[in-house]
Amino acid sequence: MLQPKRRKYRKEQKGRNTGKATRGNAVSFGEFGLKAMGRGRLTARQIESARRAMTRHIKRGGRIWIRIFPDKPISKKPAEVRMGNGKGNPEYYVAEIQPGKMLYEMDGVSEELAREAFRLAAAKLPIATNFVVRQVGT
C-alpha cells in the first residue's frame, strides 16, 4: 500500500479540507481520467482497492497512472483508553481530495473499456467522480 517512506514529523494536525483543486485537475498522462467531483479523504486501502478493480478489468492492455498519494497520517487511540495522555499513534495514511482533482488516468484502451474500468473503481471510492477524456491540444 502507498505511504510515505519518511516524514519530518510522525503526527499531523487535522486541518480543514476547503477550496477546489487548482493543480492536478487535468488529464496529463493518459487519454482518459477519473476526476473527483466531491471532497473527502481517500485512504491508502481505498486507492489500492480501486487500482486493483481497474487493473483486473483492463487485463493486460493499457496503462494506469495514480495521480494522488496518501501523505497525511491519521492517528487513533487504542480501544478503551481514557481521554488525555497525549495524541494516539498514526494508524493509516490518507490523501485529502478537493473537487476537480484527477485521481486516476488510463491510456492504451478503448473508451468503453476505460469507462467501465473507472465505473468499477468509482464504486470503491467514498466520493463522487466523473469520467473525463483528454481535450485535443493538451
Curated annotation (Swiss-Prot):
Q: How does it assemble?
A: Part of the 50S ribosomal subunit.
Protein family membership: Belongs to the universal ribosomal protein uL16 family.
Cross-referenced InterPro entries? Ribosomal_uL16, Ribosomal_uL16_bact-type, Ribosomal_uL16_CS, Ribosomal_uL16_dom, Ribosomal_uL16_sf
| DNA-binding is among the record's keywords | no
User: What protein name does the entry list?
Assistant: Large ribosomal subunit protein uL16
Region Disordered: which residues?
1-24
Gene Ontology, cellular component aspect: cytosolic large ribosomal subunit
GO biological process: one example? translation
Query: Does the keyword Cell inner membrane belong to this entry?
Result: no
Keywords, sorted A to Z: Ribonucleoprotein, Ribosomal protein, RNA-binding, rRNA-binding, tRNA-binding
Identify the SUPFAM superfamilies for this entry: Ribosomal protein L16p/L10e (SSF54686)
Task: Give start-end positions of Basic residues composition bias.
Answer: 1-13
- Give the Gene Ontology MF terms in alphabetical order: rRNA binding; structural constituent of ribosome; tRNA binding
One Pfam family in the UniProt entry: Ribosomal_L16
PROSITE patterns for the chain: RIBOSOMAL_L16_1
Q: What does this protein do?
A: Binds 23S rRNA and is also seen to make contacts with the A and possibly P site tRNAs.
